[in-house]
Design a protein with these regions (language model features):
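Positively charged n-region of N-terminal signal peptides that target proteins for export
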Residues: 1-4
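Cleavable N-terminal signal peptides
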Residues: 6-8, 17
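Alpha-helix termination/capping residues and helix-transition junctions
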Residues: 10-11, 95
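Alpha-helical transmembrane segments and their juxtamembrane interfaces
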Residues: 12-13, 187
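Sec/Tat signal peptide C-region and signal peptidase I cleavage site
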Residues: 13-19
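Low-complexity, acidic/polar, glycine-enriched regions of mature
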Residues: 19-191
Length: 191
């Protein structure tokens, strides 16, 4: 009886594992950006050029998706070299001590068809806090070049600098507390 139970458990675990698909973002067709307000009168946009995101899901509508994101903070780019160098310094991202920023999803809930609230833990500047973002699943299509399935996603949300003790010296008049996150990603099957 014990052997049958162990075999049944192994079979169920294998079935569940094979039912899940892992997807990885295509760096050439993915973007992770942000907007922050400078002096409360002008928006500054930037991107991270080096990031990796995986999704694990078993449902075709991704309603059970789990996201894992790792961002290389040294890859920040605002199209102004002087500002980018300052943003990498201890005044802001402190990339020498915090070379990565991460997000691990903890839950996903449907808002409407293909629109979800994605919750998870964001680690920025050594501080981990729960955040919730809006996620849109934009569909899956067979890529005419690779002949493999690609899935598209769009994500938006707002985080607060103060929640992560990020650049407190900037105060609330130099930089807005709210940072808008905008991401678009094209993901291909990894398995």
């Amino acid at each position: 009886m014990k052997k049958i139970t162990i075999l049944a458990a192994a079979f169920l675990m294998t079935t569940v594992a094979f039912g899940q698909t892992t997807w990885k973002n295509d760096p050439m067709h993915s973007k992770l950006g942000f907007t922050i307000t400078h002096l409360m009168v002008s928006d500054v946009d930037g991107i991270f050029k080096d990031f990796h995101c995986t999704i694990v899901a078993s449902k075709p509508d991704f309603s059970d998706a789990k996201f894992q994101l790792t961002v290389n903070t040294t890859s920040i780019n605002t199209d102004v070299d002087y500002r980018d160098k300052d943003l990498r310094s201890a005044n802001y991202f402190d990339v020498a001590n915090f070379p990565t920023m991460t997000f691990t999803s903890t839950g996903i809930s449907a808002v409407s068809t293909n629109h979800y609230k994605l919750s998870g833990n964001l680690t920025l500047h050594g501080v981990t806090k729960p955040v919730t973002m809006d996620l849109w699943y934009r569909g899956t299509i067979t890529n005419p070049m690779s002949k493999k399935d690609d899935a598209g996603f769009k994500l938006t949300g707002i985080i607060k600098r103060s929640d992560f003790n990020f650049a407190p010296q900037a105060g609330s008049t130099m930089l807005s507390d709210e940072i808008t996150i905008n991401a678009n990603g094209e993901f291909g099957k990894a398995n």
